């Protein structure tokens, strides 16, 4: 088990639940804009927000933001200290030693920074070692964890377009979480930071580390499908994105196999040719016209 630190009132490490982070893409000098984004992140489920503080003007903005932020904030200079090692900014000496940003180079850089802090008697530190290459990031985190117990912030950086970023992040973060490695995570996307939070929540749910929120299961469609299943699944996902009930909802493409295949779901819908059924634990509850399926599902979930 890792040692524990506190960021504001949020515990990181020491057996605490994995914490979701995101980073603002506003200018820290834009106090009101930054606060709006922080509030949106908090509403989505973010627990810690990071801001860039590159100069004194930004530091003044950061101070104002701290006064009203509903979330603990992390900046370049903040307590507790976060050591962030990135493959794109390694010391030239380490690049010459290892040839390129290897996992070993990232870990050695992290330990060099930790040693500087430990010599000053400071141990309240969280460490991050990120790479845009999934195997390198995973190997670095595993190597670091085998050597010490500082809490780890994990994530893949510079992940590319959103679809690629989601896959890379799910692979890298998910592999480590299933190994029991990782105390706080960020899914880095070239997108609205709120989408990073939703993705992080989905990864934690898929890894079995977070029960809060809806788990949607749906079939991949086949020749029996007689409804717009893709559109229906997307509408269900959008409608239930902020639902905090720990339930599994099935959206199936046919009434022949759908309810049986999704019998483990708490509730679900299956479509036929112009009609469909609402079911719970594989048993039919109601037969409905297709256009009434989604409203009926949402009403039933609301009443659960």
Sequence positions of predicted segments:
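Conserved, mostly hydrophobic/aromatic
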Residues: 20, 76, 83, 127, ...
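Active-site mouth loops of central-metabolism enzymes
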Residues: 15-33, 52-54, 73-75, 94-107, ...
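N-terminal amphipathic alpha-helix/helix-capping segment at the start of soluble metabolic enzymes
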Residues: 1-23, 32, 238
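Alpha-helix-loop-beta-strand connector modules within alpha/beta enzyme cores
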Residues: 56-78, 143-152, 236-238
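Terminal leader/tail segments of proteins
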Residues: 263-264, 270-274, 283, 288-304
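Catalytic alpha/beta core domains of metabolic enzymes, predominantly
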Residues: 85-89, 94-244
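Glycine-rich, proline-tolerant flexible connector loops at the mouths of alpha/beta enzymes
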Residues: 25, 30, 42-71, 125-134
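Hydrophobic alpha-helical bundle architecture
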Residues: 232-263
